[in-house]
Amino acid sequence: RMIYSCLVDADFLDTEAFMKQGKTERDPGTRIEELYRKLDKYLENKRWLENKKPDTINGRRSEILRHCMDMGTQEKGMFRLTVPTGGGKTIASLAFALRHAAAHQMKRIIYVIPYTNIIEQNAQVFREILGEENVLESHCNIDYTSSEELRPMQLASENWDKPVVVTTNVQFFESLFASKSSKCRKLHNIANSVIIFDEAQMIPPEHLKPCLAVIEELAAQYGSSVVLCTATQ
């Protein structure tokens, strides 16, 4: 399936280049290293790391953030992040992912979230920090065909060719299991990525075995790192 995904995407891209006479409307976005610098500047401006009082909410957020940033230098693999609601999990997980991706020359960060309202909230936060052109929302409520200005995003949604992708459980696992070439096209761009499952406990129990099997395969054989996030134990 990984080889098939490469072939399908290459075929689509070659056809697109031929039809456009070599001119591309695609914008792959900013390099991960530069995005990490953008986040660093954001944290400095917002003074996220300055509060070191453990008996305050902001102090605990800073502590969690520092720990996640420190863990970003660890070797690739499987990770778990358990942070109660209000603990700054969104920023902390992004900080880990960007530092980890920069340290290991990884291609992109993929957030997998069960609810579209949370996707929209998180994607907006990421856009404010990293820039609109670097964050792709990929779910059923998004329509990139309504404006010519959104054409690069429409093209990126076909194969997830952006540095930060925010998507649903359904879209992510369809890319891994579905038989349609249009779904499988994204698969090779999942390799060598940091994959963050927010609210990981929401994966349906009846689907856990195959889902965990492919997640472990991505980490073991395809250079990805996986973070399982939850606000509950």
Tell me the role of every PLM-derived stretch.
Residues 170-173, 183-221, 226:
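SF2 helicase catalytic motif II
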Residues 75-98:
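Walker A/P-loop
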Residues 105-129, 142:
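Conserved Walker A/P-loop ATP-binding site and its immediately adjacent core
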Residues 1-50:
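N-terminal accessory nucleic-acid engagement/regulatory domains that precede
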Residues 44-82:
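Conserved pre-motif I regulatory segment
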Residues 73-75, 158-162, 178-193:
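Short basic/glycine-enriched coil/helix segment immediately N-terminal to the Walker B
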Residues 131-177:
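Inter-Walker segment of RecA-like/P-loop motor cores
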Residues 83, 140, 199:
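The Walker A (P-loop) glycine that initiates the GxxxxGKT/S ATP-binding motif of P-loop NTPases
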